[in-house]
């Protein structure tokens, strides 16, 4: 027994002991590190990690490293270095590390978001972008789809008769239906049990990802039971069962003459690969049902929670700044009025609303730390050596809260995105990357920006958003997972009197 224990400990020591680096190379300054546990004892344990990493810059500078188990992670907290990683050397840092919980979520790095660099990731990212291109014009135009769901949402809110409600569920339904239309060309009904199941799955996944899972740091612990891993497996299984039912129906009824959604594009690519009508990068094995499910799962996971969360953050900040809300509504009244629906072309005229959206994305970034990248070759950042296989994380929170780049970064100031006249949108700093950049940038950025503008302009056109009668304002602290979520809150929603009067006049013979 003692011999087995000794062998086990020696094996651990070999696996987790810091490896020798290249002789003479200059590396990022590192936190202290111990055998087996790495820098874990020296990392702050309390508070939000993105803020803790930002705080460590005071001692270690805008680029530093630490070890978790056997892995070295480099943390980036300056826009110039971040742009080098994401843009200038985007291909060199386009890998994704293997992480136990994310491996389950992505079915061993399938899909787009968590897939490692390679033919599979490149193919599925290209196909997803092709799907979004379907929705540029005509009956499938993205703007039309978003406005349909925004109208359904507003009609529901009008039935609440001024009650204070949590926007999470109706917002999630609206955004889920937009994603569903892009993926499958159909929408869920409010009472559909599949919709509730999808929402529960997303909540469960985010709950697991919001916790520190030791197995992510020490893969050797996989021999022991883990409640977090079991929960993740259950969520992914439920999600795949729901999506697989849709996939099989779509495959049965598929016609190459009618390509109208992401699933059609994936199936057509599979047909082409099977018939040898595709390029060498479209291997049929990369388009199995499991690969398709992972990609659809990524689009649902990333597309629903992110947009829903940002809209709630915008509403929360408007509740804290009622005079700003009033100014935005005045702009909407003067520029759009009440007889037509806001359109994307209004974005350059409703500049205060657009500046408010951009400021929310700055002060409360969707992903305060971007999904980790991985060096796929030996490379460098600045004059520092980065070995192949090193994880690299961009701390978006640090970029968006740097006092060197932003005046009073902790204050909510939409005017920072406007010129001195307040009539033109500007880009005040390069230290602003709400959707990432480069080869790993968010594939749904265009969709998200349109959703945020159209939903908020429609809501503010029709409703007054007020603090509930109990006077309780939403907390602006947030809860970090892959997505920076706002804590649950309620908002009192009343149909604007000016809207009522305009509708009454419009219905008069």
From Swiss-Prot:
Q: Which residues form a coiled coil?
A: none
InterPro entries in the cross-refs = Cyt_P450 (IPR001128), Cyt_P450_CS (IPR017972), Cyt_P450_E_grp-I (IPR002401), Cyt_P450_sf (IPR036396)
How does its record describe regulation of its activity?
A: Regulated predominantly by intracellular cAMP levels. The 17,20-lyase activity is stimulated by cytochrome b5, which acts as an allosteric effector increasing the Vmax of the lyase activity.
Q: Could you tell me where this protein is found in the cell?
A: Endoplasmic reticulum membrane; Microsome membrane
GO biological process per UniProt: glucocorticoid biosynthetic process; hormone biosynthetic process; progesterone metabolic process; steroid metabolic process
Instruction: Tell me which GO cellular component terms the UniProt record holds.
Output: endoplasmic reticulum membrane
Task: Provide the reaction this enzyme catalyses.
Answer: a C21-steroid + reduced [NADPH--hemoprotein reductase] + O2 = a 17alpha-hydroxy-C21-steroid + oxidized [NADPH--hemoprotein reductase] + H2O + H(+); progesterone + reduced [NADPH--hemoprotein reductase] + O2 = 17alpha-hydroxyprogesterone + oxidized [NADPH--hemoprotein reductase] + H2O + H(+); pregnenolone + reduced [NADPH--hemoprotein reductase] + O2 = 17alpha-hydroxypregnenolone + oxidized [NADPH--hemoprotein reductase] + H2O + H(+); 17alpha-hydroxyprogesterone + reduced [NADPH--hemoprotein reductase] + O2 = androst-4-ene-3,17-dione + acetate + oxidized [NADPH--hemoprotein reductase] + H2O + 2 H(+)
Give the signal sequence positions: none
What pathway, per the record?
A: Steroid hormone biosynthesis; Steroid biosynthesis; glucocorticoid biosynthesis
**Molecular function via GO:** heme binding; iron ion binding; lyase activity; steroid 17-alpha-monooxygenase activity
| Cofactor(s) the record lists | heme
One Pfam family from the UniProt entry? Answer: p450
Name-wise, this protein is Steroid 17-alpha-hydroxylase/17,20 lyase
Report the source organism: Bos taurus (Bovine)
Q: Taxonomic classification, please?
A: Eukaryota, Metazoa, Chordata, Craniata, Vertebrata
Name the gene that codes for it: CYP17A1
